[in-house]
Swiss-Prot record:
Cofactor note: Binds 1 Fe(2+) ion per subunit.
NCBIfam families (alphabetical): arch_KAE1, gcp_kae1
Enzyme Commission number, as recorded: 2.3.1.234
Listed name of the protein: tRNA N6-adenosine threonylcarbamoyltransferase
Catalytic activity: L-threonylcarbamoyladenylate + adenosine(37) in tRNA = N(6)-L-threonylcarbamoyladenosine(37) in tRNA + AMP + H(+)
GO molecular function annotations of the record: iron ion binding; N(6)-L-threonylcarbamoyladenine synthase activity
Regions annotated as coiled coil: none
Length: 333
């Protein structure tokens, strides 16, 4: 069974193909906003619409496949930016109608988790999903991913991106801020807003910008921001490990590329005899392969829709999604 997956939730448009549960390849293109600006949903959507046909053709040609070889089409149905989501959904519906094949709506966050589990051979981990749109500590229980802790305002990646943009470090913000932080050998005190199991990152950005305006060297502020943001995550991860007793920690999402985050989470997890497994860099950011893979799992368990009944959801909680395929991944592929 050949599944084509379409990702278009934010700044990246990507298509991936999975055959019988194995990732074959993916291809994508990322919208880079003008210097000093954030992602404009309409401009991201125009970018996706402009590049989608060529990406689809190139991927099929690269794999020696015809469009008619596709058995199922999956698409990221949310959460995300409405105009960008709709570009992927329209393409998915068009393909489903043209080919007469099933259509599978996929939750973007669940897809991040499943590609991380697939690539790390993790069975029943505590998951740390960190990206521009997600900051969630979650684990599986009773048919769904249950949230042990999450951001109460902005996601960690978004927060660092905003800071980087405001101080002129460019986009994407996380690697730029981490690079700047390398020049510092000290840190300054930051608030650590942890409310129960939940986190707040909006205030960290405000505090960091105030420090820059007051004359604190930029590398020192960058280092302090990064260390505080990551140690806040580690605190919640430790609490979740103490509660769940899980022995695997999977880090998924674009911020999983951070070497410093890996170090901090590995140290925290080691205190609970848990092993940290990191999604490979090529699958850390938004990608079509994770949509195709999750679409494959979902379709095998009877989850699909028709073009007339398909949807996009700009807001869609992770713990509102059934994952009946969860234990299928516990057997090595």
């Amino acid at each position: 069974m050949l599944v084509l997956g379409i990702e278009s939730t934010a700044h990246t448009f990507s298509i991936g193909i999975v055959k019988d549960g194995k990732i074959l390849s993916q291809l994508g293109k990322t919208y880079i906003p003008p210097s000093g600006a954030g992602i404009h949903p309409r401009e991201a959507a125009e970018h996706h619409a402009r590049h989608a046909p060529a990406i689809l053709r190139q991927l099929l040609d690269m794999l020696g496949l015809a469009l008619s070889d596709v058995d199922v089409v999956a698409y990221a149905a949310g959460p995300g930016l409405g105009p960008a989501l709709r570009i992927g959904a329209v393409l998915a519906r068009a393909l489903a109608i043209k080919l007469g094949i099933p259509l599978v709506p996929v939750h973007h966050g669940v897809a991040h988790i499943e590609v991380a589990r697939y690539t790390t051979n993790a069975c029943d981990p505590l998951v740390v999903l960190v990206s521009g749109g997600h900051t969630v500590i979650t684990g599986y229980s009773d048919g769904r991913y249950r949230v042990f802790g999450e951001t109460l305002d902005v996601a960690i990646g978004n927060a660092i991106d905003v800071f980087a943009r405001e101080v002129g470090l460019g986009f994407p913000g996380v690697p730029a801020v981490e690079k700047c932080a390398e020049a510092a050998d000290t840190v300054v005190a930051f608030p650590m807003p942890i409310i129960g199991q939940d986190l707040s990152y909006a205030g960290l950005v405000t505090h960091a910008l105030q420090l820059v305006k007051s004359g604190t060297p930029l590398p020192v502020v960058c280092k302090s921001l990064i260390e505080t943001a990551y140690y806040m995550l580690a605190e919640v991860v430790e609490r979740a490990l103490a509660y769940t007793k899980k022995k695997e920690v999977v880090v998924a999402g674009g911020v999983a590329r951070s070497k410093r985050l890996r170090e901090i989470l590995s140290a925290a997890s080691g205190e609970h005899d848990a092993v940290v497994k990191i999604v490979p860099d090529e699958y850390a950011g938004d990608n079509g392969a994770m949509i195709a893979l999750t679409g494959y799992y979902a379709y095998k368990h009877g989850i699909y829709t028709t073009p007339e009944q398909s949807f996009v959801k700009q807001r869609w909680r992770l713990d509102n999604v059934d994952v009946p395929w969860f234990y299928d991944l516990c057997n090595p592929h």
